[in-house]
């Protein structure tokens, strides 16, 4: 089953894949990295002018990384807001996704945090640098295959 936004995008020939609905009935769409910036601009013009949040996660060790965007369209008042979740998957070996900073300014620190923790490079982001970890930090701490430097696990401490 496709949601209204998925049907609207399909009518206009915009490539995407519906991943279904979450427990709140919000549709989740998958967009390819190379299509993401143009579809983001189209969604903004269509009325999704509020980026509620952006996050990223490691799908599986050695697998894909995902950048997730929660967008809201407030056309008929806050009580009737439309929401959509967009997922953009990228390979960890070349984790590059177009930045949507120039579409939604609120993506600034959120994309920087995703870069800092997972190493996803957001192309055309004006200030893409570490935001939580020191600049000298090596690696991406939230990747499932990350090994912390000088970290020793103590077994049976008691």
From Swiss-Prot:
Give the EC class as a word. translocase
Location relative to the cell = Plastid, Chloroplast thylakoid membrane
Question: Would you tell me the Gene Ontology cellular component terms?
Answer: chloroplast thylakoid membrane
Query: What is annotated about its quaternary structure and interactions?
Result: NDH is composed of at least 16 different subunits, 5 of which are encoded in the nucleus.
Instruction: Cite the NCBIfam families for this sequence.
Output: PRK12494.1
* Entry-linked HAMAP family: NDH1_NuoC (MF_01357)
Q: What is the name listed in the Swiss-Prot or TrEMBL entry for this protein?
A: NAD(P)H-quinone oxidoreductase subunit J, chloroplastic
Q: Which organism does this record belong to?
A: Aethionema cordifolium (Lebanon stonecress)
């Amino acid at each position: 089953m496709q949601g209204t936004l998925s049907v609207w995008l399909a009518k206009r020939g915009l490539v995407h894949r519906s991943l279904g609905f979450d427990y709140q009935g919000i549709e989740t769409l998958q967009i390819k990295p190379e299509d993401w910036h143009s579809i983001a601009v189209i969604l903004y013009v269509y009325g999704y002018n509020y980026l509620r949040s952006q996050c990223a996660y490691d799908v599986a060790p050695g697998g894909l990384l995902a950048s997730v965007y929660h967008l809201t369209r407030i056309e008929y008042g806050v009580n009737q807001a439309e929401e959509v979740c967009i997922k953009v998957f990228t390979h960890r070996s070349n984790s590059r996704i177009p930045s949507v900073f120039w579409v939604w300014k609120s993506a600034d620190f959120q994309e920087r945090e995703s870069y800092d923790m997972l190493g996803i490079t957001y192309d055309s982001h004006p200030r893409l640098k570490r935001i939580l970890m020191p600049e000298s930090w090596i690696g991406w701490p939230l990747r499932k295959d990350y090994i912390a430097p000088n970290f020793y696990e103590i077994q049976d401490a008691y």
